[in-house]
Amino acid sequence: MHYPTEADTSTGPNPSATSAPVRPRHVTPSLSPSSSSSPSPDSFYYFLAAAVILTAALAAALLTPNPGCTIVITGHTTIIQGSCPIPPQLVLAAHPRGLSLEQYLKFTNTLPDGSQHRSHR
């Protein structure tokens, strides 16, 4: 007759059966380095929209006239309006008949609205 021994009735863990504990696996989404560096399809459209807006803003800025300096040269007169830091040589070379230094000084006294400074002589 066989009597149960302590090894047969043991409620403790069996060393051969529990050498590697088995844990339940929880599946969590993990980002691999390759998937985190590639943009999603939605981000492509955001980048495209940003590029289009930036290009449109740049084109609008470049096509807007700048009222800083206006020079009109005709056969008889030269009109300089606005704040134009122009050397006398450039004005003399630009006018077909040439200008005297006195006329250039009159141009340099021109206010941004086109009127002349009043000089006391």
Curated annotation (Swiss-Prot):
Positions on the Lumenal side per record topology: 1-43
Low complexity bias spans: 29-40
InterPro entries (UniProt xref): TGBp3 (IPR003411)
Pfam families the UniProt entry points to: TGBp3
Top-level taxon of origin: Viruses
Record topology, Cytoplasmic segments: 65-121
Keywords: Host endoplasmic reticulum, Host membrane, Membrane, Transmembrane, Transmembrane helix, Transport, Viral movement protein
Location of the region described as Disordered in the Swiss-Prot/TrEMBL record: 1-40
Polar residues biased stretches: 7-19
GO biological process: transport of virus in host, cell to cell
Location of the protein in the cell: Host endoplasmic reticulum membrane
Membrane-spanning ranges: 44-64
Gene Ontology CC: host cell endoplasmic reticulum membrane; membrane
Family statement: Belongs to the Tymovirales TGBp3 protein family.
Note: TGBp1, TGBp2 and TGBp3 seem to act together for cell-to-cell propagation. TGBp1 is the main movement protein that physically cross the plasmodesma with the viral genome. TGBp2 and TGBp3 would facilitate TGBp1 function.
Role description: Plays a role in viral cell-to-cell propagation, by facilitating genome transport to neighboring plant cells through plasmosdesmata. May induce the formation of granular vesicles derived from the Endoplasmic reticulum, which align on actin filaments.
Name under which the protein is recorded: Movement protein TGBp3
Taxonomic placement: Viruses, Riboviria, Orthornavirae, Kitrinoviricota, Alsuviricetes
